[in-house]
């Protein structure tokens, strides 16, 4: 059994997924873009941001729909997780996972998936800023309810609101459907945005012309694709994206990986009373990792990423 013990090994798994996505999209005329922190890393570091450990892609909605419908990996190693088809899937966007790995997301009741690359659809939004704000506010409310449904932690200021939301007679699937119907706008406008996360703020919007074409960009020694208007997108969304953030804000999204076998993971799940959850983050930096390490009461037996044959 090969252990994933450092960030370099995790990145190797992720870039393997990215390579296969690039292969498939190139062969099938599907447009994709490096985005978010992945794009900042490509521009500023020609690879990962040094402390980053995830990969994000954008696809125009039509390309995204084609991708989740058609994507196949001839070797059977990778598969796409489609929010419309996966049972108990908590996200409103797709992920491509390496099926040889297991990643335990303890924040959401121990949900288990493989190491992944996130794929976000980019949708048309209203050209009117006031209307966009109204949609964003309604969408954020649905996301609050949805997060209360899936999370063990109360992220709201009011405990009463948290439990009221959690007890509403709606499923996560129903909420995902409501969010998609709200954000998917088929008629073209001059403005687009990633609408599938709790954000974006209005500054996350961009001119539709910015994603009408793509350009090559280097990432970890290989060439991939990003949107033609990537400089405007980065400036609008992140400000001075070439400037490094303060040291105390350089936190990874996934907590540093350790590994064990799938058998051990299943044993952990069955004997969860013997375990406690431990947050791995520097206090005071405002960072809330999406994945928490499930830690055994006995020191030295932590689990996050589990490779298996």
Regions found by a protein language model. Name each.
Residues 22-55, 59, 64, 209, ...:
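Active-site nucleotide-donor binding segment shared across nucleotidyl transfer reactions
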Residues 160-162, 252, 260, 284, ...:
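Intrinsic disorder/low-complexity segments
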Residues 128-134:
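A short secondary-structure junction signal
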Residues 138-154:
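Short, cationic low-complexity segments
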Residues 2-26, 68-127, 147, 151, ...:
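Conserved catalytic core of two-metal-ion nucleotidyltransferases
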Residues 273-301, 307-309:
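Positively charged N-terminal leader segments that act as targeting/secretion signals
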Residues 49, 53, 66, 232-233, ...:
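Generic secondary-structure boundary signal with a strong preference for alpha-helix termini
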């Amino acid at each position: 059994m090969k252990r994933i013990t450092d960030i370099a090994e995790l990145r190797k798994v992720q870039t393997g997924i990215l390579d296969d996505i690039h292969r498939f999209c190139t062969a099938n005329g599907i447009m994709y873009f490096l985005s978010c922190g992945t794009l900042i890393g490509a521009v500023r570091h020609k690879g990962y941001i040094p402390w980053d450990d995830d990969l994000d892609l954008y696809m125009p909605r039509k390309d995204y729909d084609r991708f989740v419908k058609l994507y196949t990996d001839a070797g059977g190693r990778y598969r796409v997780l489609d929010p419309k088809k996966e049972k108990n899937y908590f996200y409103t966007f797709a992920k491509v996972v390496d099926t040889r790995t297991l990643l335990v997301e303890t924040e959401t009741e121990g949900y288990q998936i493989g190491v992944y690359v996130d794929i976000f659809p980019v949708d048309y939004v209203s050209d009117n800023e006031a209307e966009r704000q109204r949609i964003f506010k309604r969408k954020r409310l649905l996301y609050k309810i949805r997060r209360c449904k899936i999370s063990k932690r109360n992220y709201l200021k009011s405990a009463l609101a948290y439990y009221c939301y959690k007890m509403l007679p709606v499923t996560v699937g129903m909420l995902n459907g409501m969010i998609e119907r709200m954000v998917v706008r088929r008629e073209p406008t001059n403005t687009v945005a990633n609408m599938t996360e709790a954000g974006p703020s209005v500054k996350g919007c961009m001119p539709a012309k910015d994603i009408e074409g793509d350009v090559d960009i280097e990432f970890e020694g290989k060439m991939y694709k990003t949107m033609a208007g990537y400089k405007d997108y980065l400036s609008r969304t992140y400000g001075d994206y070439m400037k490094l953030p303060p040291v105390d804000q350089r936190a990874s999204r996934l907590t540093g990986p350790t590994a064990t076998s799938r058998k051990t993971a299943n044993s952990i799940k069955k004997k969860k009373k013997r375990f406690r959850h431990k947050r791995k983050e520097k206090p005071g930096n405002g960072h809330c990792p999406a994945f928490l390490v499930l830690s055994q009461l006995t020191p030295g037996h932590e689990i996050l990423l589990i490779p298996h044959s």
